[in-house]
Amino acid sequence: MRLTLNNAEIFASTGGRDFDPSGPVVLFVHGSGQSHLGFMLQHRFFANRGFQCITPDMPGHGLSKGEALTTIKAMADWYAQFMQALGIPKATLVGHSMGGLIELELASHYPDLVAKAAFISTALAIPVNDALINLAAAKEGAAIGAMMDWGHGAAGHIHDHTMPGTSHMLYGSRLMAGNA
């Protein structure tokens, strides 16, 4: 699904299904440098069980246009505007990493929009390591590789996945490189 919000074309995954905001809505909130792709399997799981799932790419991420937002408050306001633009009265939020911080801010300022919230790998403070910032400035590919190592650990290099031909390391690297 594509829509225009704040003069930017926004992409939102609906799992290939028609979206009905009057049904039980699950809104997935991605983290920094991520996109709707990070929730593909979860999205499919809930969509096939009667939930109305939607996963927008924030401005400057994934398939969405526009400048990336720079504060958690601005991101929470953006999600509230997104929900209002689609006529979503209330949603269960599922946020990953920074997405969890966005959920907290959204629930704090727009409690009527939030039915429930689930948090995946979230903390109240998520500072970016100075070594990672320096590495990204010097060698973007090496910084992405380091993030994949930290995120998946040694087992991630085995490429063991329940879906043949799928690698979390490759998938994650391509996702991060696409948003760099």
Label every PLM stretch briefly.
Residues 22-31:
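Short beta-strand element of the alpha/beta-hydrolase
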Residues 3-15, 40-48, 52-98:
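Active-site loop/oxyanion-hole signature of alpha/beta-hydrolase fold enzymes
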Residues 101-146:
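Flexible "cap/lid" loop of the alpha/beta hydrolase fold
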Residues 22, 87-90, 111-112:
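Active-site acidic short loop of glycosyltransferases
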Residues 31-34, 97:
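Active-site glycine-rich loops that stabilize anionic/oxyanionic intermediates
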Residues 33, 58-62, 124:
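Alpha/beta-hydrolase active-site loop signature
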Residues 127, 134-180:
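Conserved alpha/beta-hydrolase catalytic His-Asp/Glu region
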